[in-house]
Amino acid sequence: MQRDTQVFDLIAKEKERQLNGLELIASENFVSEAVLEAAGSVLTNKYAEGYPGKRYYGGCEVVDQVEQLAIDRLKELFNAEYANVQPHSGSQANTAVFHTVMKPGDKFLGFDLSHGGHLTHGSPVNFSGKLYNPVFYGVDKETGLIDYDAVAEIAEKEKPKMIIAGASAYSREIDYKRFREIADSVGAILVADMAHPAGLIAKGLISDPLPHCHIVTSTTHKTLRGPRGGIILMGKDFENPFGEKLKNGNLKKMSTMLNSGIFPGNQGGPLEHIIAAKAIAFGEALTDEFLHYTVQVKKNAEKLAQAFVEKDYKVISGGTDNHMMLIDLRNKNVSGKEAEEALSKADITVNKNMVPFDDKSPFVTSGIRIGTPAVTTRGLQENDMNKIVDLIDRVITNIENDTELEAVKKEVNSMMSGRPLFVA
């Protein structure tokens, strides 16, 4: 069959874009050649509905071993008793948890999207806000930090069945112990969504949700530096508190219910080529090299945030404890949309993002979200962060000056020239 040059030419263009630019989107990263190889392997040919040893198709002897290896490595990485590696995405993992814990119309408490939460934490345009009854907590207007006393007050008033601790645009440590105390006080299931900082959590660099939360979900890309996908974890399995029973009359374990929440609850056959790529990424994450990488991600983020503050940019909460930061551009009289578009012309990729108490729409926004996982994978270190902020500042202050944007682009291209996508 003739090679599809139209598609492969586009893939080549995308590779050039990634090689030439500064990738500062906090949710993006670059995977190893081994992860890429597994994701493009013959495992994509195999259907495997069910779980290892309990499939609805024949010929699963090898993919059973692949999936079990991914499960075992993931358990070791997070010291977890239970792991499911089948979710196609973090959103699918969250969907399975909702299906397992909640019934349509049940109330839950999530992080307000405009304050740093995620679509699946109760946005009205998402299944979580359409099928269920969300109430929200947020951050303090002055500090930009989660107000745990306010969370406790809302929980006491609303009595949610489930509380979600986690964010897509929050740069500080999350106090999972305090969240568990709040959840226990109202009899709620506590779910952590650690999609963003999972790699840092795995190496002990920031607080670990598994000892405190009933259920933990994550993506496998971002700071875990694996293929695009999702996972579900529990530090300890436990009998479900909803009275769901097996045929023998015993209470079902939450692991059984979560597995059913994924298959057949909201997915069919798992993507075994992606699960193989996950297994490789988990293996990489178990190494000392990955520890060195995550330490550098955190150092780079701290330095980047500091450099923004020194340039009179407002960093929400004043800094970062993880891999990302949220920049409020209102004192620069530039919208997030304008900044994203101008930076893109200079081969600097960020995403526009609402800031807490934003007065602009989600399509415009007052801020940008920036992260260091991808540039750290390419080998950049603290001494490169001031240069990055200088380049961003030149774009922000010359947003309609195409000549200056082109000059910045040339400097970006020179800065990244000769650097492979995967160094660290």
Curated annotation (Swiss-Prot):
Its recorded reaction(s) are: (6R)-5,10-methylene-5,6,7,8-tetrahydrofolate + glycine + H2O = (6S)-5,6,7,8-tetrahydrofolate + L-serine
Q: Which residues carry this modification: N6-(pyridoxal phosphate)lysine?
A: K222
UniProt-listed Enzyme Commission number(s): 2.1.2.1
**A Pfam family this protein belongs to?**
SHMT
Chief location of this protein within or outside the cell: cytoplasm
Q: Which GO terms describe its biological process?
A: glycine biosynthetic process from serine; tetrahydrofolate interconversion
Site, as annotated: Plays an important role in substrate specificity: H221
The protein's annotated pathway: One-carbon metabolism; tetrahydrofolate interconversion; Amino-acid biosynthesis; glycine biosynthesis; glycine from L-serine: step 1/1
Identify the keywords attached in UniProt to this record, alphabetized: Amino-acid biosynthesis, Cytoplasm, One-carbon metabolism, Pyridoxal phosphate, Transferase
Give the UniProt subcellular location, in the record's own words: Cytoplasm
- Which residues bind (6S)-5,6,7,8-tetrahydrofolate per the record? L113, G117, H118, L119, S361, P362, F363
| Molecular function terms from GO | glycine hydroxymethyltransferase activity; pyridoxal phosphate binding
Please give the GO cellular component terms listed in this UniProt entry: cytosol
Quaternary state and interactors: Homodimer.
| Primary role | Catalyzes the reversible interconversion of serine and glycine with tetrahydrofolate (THF) serving as the one-carbon carrier. This reaction serves as the major source of one-carbon groups required for the biosynthesis of purines, thymidylate, methionine, and other important biomolecules. Also exhibits THF-independent aldolase activity toward beta-hydroxyamino acids, producing glycine and aldehydes, via a retro-aldol mechanism.
The record's similarity note reads: Belongs to the SHMT family.
What protein name applies here?
Serine hydroxymethyltransferase
Recorded source organism is Christiangramia forsetii (strain DSM 17595 / CGMCC 1.15422 / KT0803) (Gramella forsetii)
